[in-house]
């Protein structure tokens, strides 16, 4: 087969604050010929996750993205050429494909999916959504980090995002007595209760007193706070946690674009209410992804 090319987004410069059109650059690159055990994949979708933001500016648990390097992310694609006996042309696969239109990759670095699983409302993007990193983050955050028990009340920030929305639905399926989501618009809040199965929602932009709104919506307090935001919202949520409450720290949306992180300031309740807070990286549970996806 003749020479093939890919279009790829790379990091042009490190952003100060919110990334803009100067942060990224679109390049075209030739793809190499296949070697044994490799496949050529046409990428159909790639993810854009808030958790990718820190690596654009600084060192993280996955390292800092070097200037001029591909933006890394999960992706979905179709095998168009193969020298791997386990993968055929036309197979749907996922992997760490990054922001590019195609790539040559070792077959063992791809996960093959059955297209029959994705029908009706379950679109192929579920493979990198509810069954991908966002879904796994929700699952292990609730089950392994927060230790959700039957009948408990769960409060979730950024609840209309991929992680938050999945966490809310999973919490109900895992036996939570009440699940409350925090979002930033009436439309998002309406969706949480009408479509996503949340018991109540809070529009933090409209709340006259966010702490009172949290306390009222949770029915007097929460056992678990699933934190995707950090900042002032975290400090406020700490005040409404019940004795022995747990905080699972999944993300820090309020902190990612700050040059100097605000950090947590409300620490006394950790003593008086015997609270615990634990951060986690979902990749620590990667060997358990398969069984978790089957249960989901």
Where do the PLM segments sit?
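N-terminal Rossmann-like NAD(P) cofactor-binding module of classical short-chain dehydrogenase/reductase
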Residues: 94, 155, 202, 225-226
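Glycine-rich phosphate-binding loop and adjacent beta-alpha segment
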Residues: 193, 232-296
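Residues at the starts of beta-strands that form the adenosine-phosphate
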Residues: 7, 177-179, 246, 276
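Glycine-rich beta-strand-centered segment in the early N-terminal region that forms part
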Residues: 31-48, 56-99
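Mid-domain Rossmann-like dinucleotide-binding core that forms the NAD(H)/NADP(H) cofactor-binding site
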Residues: 128-207
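Short amphipathic alpha-helix with an adjacent loop that forms part of the alpha/beta core around
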Residues: 208-219
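NAD(P)H dinucleotide-binding glycine-rich loop of Rossmann-like/cofactor-binding domains
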Residues: 73-78, 89-158
């Amino acid at each position: 087969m003749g020479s093939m090319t890919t279009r790829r987004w790379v990091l042009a410069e490190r952003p100060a604050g919110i990334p803009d059109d100067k942060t990224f650059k679109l390049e075209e690159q030739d793809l190499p010929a296949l070697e044994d055990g490799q496949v050529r994949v046409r990428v159909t979708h790639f993810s854009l996750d808030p958790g990718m933001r820190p690596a654009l500016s600084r060192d993280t648990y996955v390292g800092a993205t070097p200037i001029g390097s591909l933006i890394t992310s999960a992706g979905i694609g179709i095998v168009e050429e193969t020298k791997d006996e386990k993968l055929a042309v036309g197979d749907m696969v996922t992997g760490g494909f990054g922001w590019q239109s195609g790539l040559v990759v070792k077959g063992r670095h791809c996960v093959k999916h059955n297209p029959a699983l994705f029908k009706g409302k379950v679109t192929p993007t579920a493979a990198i959504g509810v069954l991908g990193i966002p879904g796994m983050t929700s699952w292990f955050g609730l089950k392994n980090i927060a230790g959700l028990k039957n009948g408990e009340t769960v409060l979730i920030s950024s609840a209309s995002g991929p992680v938050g929305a999945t966490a809310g639905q999973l919490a109900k399926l895992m036996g939570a007595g009440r699940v409350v989501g925090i979002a930033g618009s009436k439309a998002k809040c309406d969706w949480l209760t009408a479509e996503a199965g949340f018991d109540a929602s809070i529009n933090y932009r409209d709340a006259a007193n966010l702490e009172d709104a949290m306390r009222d919506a949770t029915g007097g307090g929460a056992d678990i706070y699933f934190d995707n935001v950090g900042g002032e919202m975290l400090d406020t949520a700490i005040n409404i946690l019940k004795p022995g409450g747990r905080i699972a720290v999944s993300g820090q949306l309020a902190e990612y674009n700050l040059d100097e992180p605000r950090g947590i300031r409300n620490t006394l309740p950790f003593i008086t209410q015997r609270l615990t807070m634990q951060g986690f990286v979902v990749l620590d549970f990667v060997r358990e992804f398969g069984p978790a996806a089957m249960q989901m």
